[in-house]
Amino acid sequence: MQALCPADHVYKVAVYPDAVELDSYTPEGEWSGYGYEAGGAVLSGYRITVEDGDAVLRFNTVEWLDADIKARTILIYDATTGYALNLTQLERVVGVYGGLFEYRMPDEGVARIG
């Protein structure tokens, strides 16, 4: 896993208000609003765990405080290379205006190799 997702890379989460299919980061169609910067938020808590024989990449929950955000697609990507690691399509558009927007990482991890 560390060969594919090195610990010294920068990882980010970007938000898109529409359903989009991506294999890398693009600013095209990305959310733009108060409290949200283009490119998204830098992820913290990089860790690789072993679960049922699989290597699993995990990060901490991401929070935007006092933000205006509308999301339908969440992209977790390697900002060093631009490549997508995980793309989540939400069932519906969710958002917050002038409040806390929190994204919890997928229970199965961001990436899994087994």
Set out the residue ranges of the language-model regions:
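Small cysteine-rich, disulfide-bonded extracellular modules of the LU/uPAR three-finger superfamily
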Residues: 1-72, 79-114
